[in-house]
Amino acid sequence: MAPVSLPPGFRFHPTDEELITYYLKRKINGQEIELEIIPEVDLYKCEPWDLPGKSLIPSKDQEWFFFSPRDRKYPNGSRTNRATKGGYWKATGKDRRVSWRDRAIGTKKTLVYYRGRAPHGIRTGWVMHEYRLDESECEPSAFGMQDAYALCRVFKKIVIEAKPRDQHQQQHQPYVHTSSNISGSSSFDVCSDLEISSNTPYNTAAHIQPRFGNANAISDHDDWSQYLSQNMPTSFSDYGSPYGPYLTQSKVNTEVQCEMFQHQMSLPPLRVENSQAQTSDFSKRLHQNSGQSGFDDFTFAASNSNQFYNSNVDDHLIHIGNLDEQSYIEEQELILPSFQSNDQDLELYGGSRTNTIDNIEIDDFFSFENQAQDNDNSNVTPNSAGFEMIGEEIIVNHKMLISTRQTTEILYYQVVPSQILKIHINPVHGNEERTMLMEEDSDDSWFQKAENVAKMKLKQISLVAKRYYKCLTIIF
């Protein structure tokens, strides 16, 4: 049959109902079709890319229609053989019912072509809709022939593969280094009418790099200390740490830590052992106002000391390592107020004093060490006579930094009322009961003996009587 040419503007786009009620029903019942535009081709003996050349309608819509006879896989079976030379058609999804005027007229099955042999076939973009006629639509003359032909719509779906996205990396921040790797790929594959499969891995890695430095790194600390500057006591504004902040992952965590510092009643103390400075009245007054002992909240361990106070409670530790490589030798100046009227002299480096005091404790100290000076040789000489300046050479070897947060331990006690056990002892009453029981037992024993003797006599008499009666019956 020669290809049919349609006038310009005409397209062959029948619906599912039209394909079954008109074309397939007339083909099975042997009725005439006005325009023979659907050829009869054995689809399971041809490859799908050869089918466009067998179509009678030249179409640019990438859609072709064919009548295909049914090829049984087994002679006595009902399964259809859908294997070709280069691959096979595999059914996907469930069979859908096609209705017309609220009446089932047929079924629609979706199949996908795979290259190779099952189960290792490669999926392609060729799709086929197989229409079959319902048994109720067959005429009596064609009864049982509803499976003789199937009307197939063959088309090819275009597989769309999206390009992978570019990898984006965020800029390095002073304390937090964040890098993200985003790559995605999506593919538009064929299954039924529309199938989309995507694979979008998302991997985000965050690296936190703390910064340590000398006294010149105070400016880097301003980014973190600005969150602590608000709602803090003004007497501690001069203290600071030359090093970077703790291991914080974001500014949100920093703000949470700031809130924790603000709600505490006292700030962490600092203990300096083996110091030759005198404990002043000012430090004692601060110790009384704190209302807590020295190592309640924070503990700073210098040199090789790894002991910290009250380790039996739940502590949250923050450890900063890699501090063994850096050692600082600095000259610190301790300015201690003295309210004594007799002490009015100021001593600089190299001075001598007669008073030697040990074990100074400075409470309510915000940072874990004094703020480093920009110039080692710069000395500040106060004009007031109430201050004393003591020059010390302190060698600090930073080993470990431990921050602890203690929680209260609640103990519950249960008071159980005492129980009283009363015991009554009456030996006289017990002896009377024993004597009464013995008398009753003695009476019962004599009566029982008499009763037993009477029973024995009666048994003997009954035995003699039975023997006598037996003898009489034998004689007579």
Curated annotation (Swiss-Prot):
Residue ranges of the annotated DNA-binding region, renumbered to this chain: 105-163
Matching PROSITE patterns: NAC
Pfam family, one: NAM
Phenotype on disruption: No visible phenotype, due to the redundancy with NAC045 (AC A4VCM0). Nac045 and nac086 double mutants exhibit seedling lethality with defective development of the protophloem sieve element.
InterPro entries: NAC-dom (IPR003441), NAC_dom_sf (IPR036093)
Top-rank taxon: Eukaryota
Location of this chain's protein in the cell: Nucleus
Tissue specificity note: Expressed in a few sieve element cells before enucleation and in phloem-pole pericycle cells.
GO annotation terms (biological process): sieve element differentiation; sieve element enucleation
Record's keyword terms, sorted: DNA-binding, Nucleus, Transcription, Transcription regulation
NAC domain location: 6-157
GO cellular component terms given for this protein: nucleus
A single MF term (Gene Ontology): DNA-binding transcription factor activity
Transferase is among the record's keywords: no
PANTHER family per record: NAC DOMAIN-CONTAINING PROTEIN 86-LIKE, PROTEIN CUP-SHAPED COTYLEDON 2-RELATED
Role played: Transcription factor directing sieve element enucleation and cytosol degradation. Not required for formation of lytic vacuoles. Regulates, with NAC045, the transcription of NEN1, NEN2, NEN3, NEN4, RTM1, RTM2, UBP16, PLDZETA, ABCB10 and At1g26450.
Domains: entry comment: The NAC domain includes a DNA binding domain and a dimerization domain.
Protein name in UniProt: NAC domain-containing protein 86
Organism: Arabidopsis thaliana
Lineage of origin: Eukaryota, Viridiplantae, Streptophyta, Embryophyta, Tracheophyta
